[in-house]
Amino acid sequence: MNNFHRILYSNDEIIKQRNTKWYFAVIIFIVSVMLIATPFVSAKLLESPKSLMNQFKGVENGMIQALTDYDCQITNKTLDCQQEFSTYTNGDYQFFINVTEGQELDLPDKYVLFSQEVVTIFTRDGHLQGDYTLLDGTSFNELLELKEEENLDNQTLTGHLLQNISQSTLGTHIPQTYISVFIQYFIYVGLVSLVNMAINANRLKEKISFKQFVTMNILAMFSLALITAIIGLFSPVNATAIFPLLYMARVIMIYFKLLKSNQN
């Protein structure tokens, strides 16, 4: 493809390249999707103990109570407690300890659930779920000993526990994110291209095929996806909001450019 670099900034070039080979458009689409997904992935990777504690305010005292009152060992990524299932309330959170699979629970608005395989923290504003992968081989007593040895306060230790729980899902979170973004924009590009065809059916002298509209809409993604990925490394939340707005603006500009050039 000649003048590839020009599609990064030139809408005219995107229109000119609408007949490019299909496999090149597929490659551009896949790379763009990976770039668009970067903010979602980096948001997970950049989660800090402090940010997690801000999300789940007031959970720390109840977590320390769980470590203090229950004799539990994590072996082969499974929680093994000497005590039977029990529940207690600390602050705004209700805690469920040693929950077995299939056990029925009456869950409140805010809760922390330690099952044998998974930890879940839930509030109306968000939730966190993960397993014991990064805590494997430790016990509640050892975590308390670490707190004393390192002179950690309740918030700091709890923040690191939440981070370990969150990061345990990276192996599934990252591929799921890429697949989700791929499906989302596969449908989105197809729908936008169909709308382009419907609007332009009787307005353009030169007929533009569905494939050509798809190609133009894919080429329009690349530079914006690159910008999104760069911003996402520093500000994931802003990056995820910016791309759809920029992309739709560019698609509209290409549409009017195409309409103007086709009528001349």
What kind of region is each of these model predictions?
Residues M1-F56, A225, I230-G232:
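Internal alpha-helical transmembrane segments
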Residues T123, G171-Y178, F182, A239-Y247, ...:
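Alpha-helical propensity feature that highlights long, continuous alpha-helices across diverse contexts
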